[in-house]
Amino acid sequence: MKKVLFLLFLPIITFGQVAVADFVHLEKGADNDYHTLEQIWEPFHLQEIKEEKKVGWAVWKFDKTPEMDKAPDYLVFNFYKDENQAKSYQDNFDWEIARKKIESLNKRKFSKATLRNIFNKKIKNEVRQYTIKLIDQTVRAGGEVKIGDKLSFGAMKQLNDDYENYELNVFMPMWEKQLLNGKIKQWSFTKVIDKNEVALDKTHMTFIINNNANPNDVEFISSNKWLNDKLIEHGLNSREFVSAEATLIYTSN
């Protein structure tokens, strides 16, 4: 399938654009405060998008994560038109300017005391941040991504030089068949181009919207089971893999 718009998390984000992905691990018992925090930030993100400082924002709540130290509770995406815009936004971000803007945008919804209380709380225990860039994806079926949609997430560590070719030439065609069978909404393959100091040693990520697929439903080479199984085996051995499931709860869409 030909390359199309990168429609993974919001309606319009094209090849060449990047996403900054924050995997957020909360302090114990901080879930309600975290929702208040995101609701406070939401009008700020929407205004930044309107001013063309970024192109999108979305928050996913993890339903199922791997057993690991400080497993993430939420996944937050900020989308930018290119790497330069993302870097410029992060390098020039001024908290005092942002705070005043947030107060102005929320003056009819939250008091200054509420804002101050939330901002002074330690809600996030750790944030593992990755900047990712799209390599390729299937087309998207079933309309726009919306609140309540499900995300199947995979984080990979590349183990050999053939890994990307296996994703693009073995696994992507299999996911395209799952899409044609109505089992998924979209599959996307991204590469990590930057990360913060506490981020894990991951090189790539895959994302599947509304995944109802059975891996046994589709073979890559249906006429040769041995060759099909060998290709899949070598593809799986070309990377380390952890997976998780999440639900979309906030979006600029």
Predicted regions span which residues?
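Short S/T/G/P-rich N-terminal loop/turn motif that feeds into the first structured element of a domain
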Residues: 16-75, 79-99, 108-253
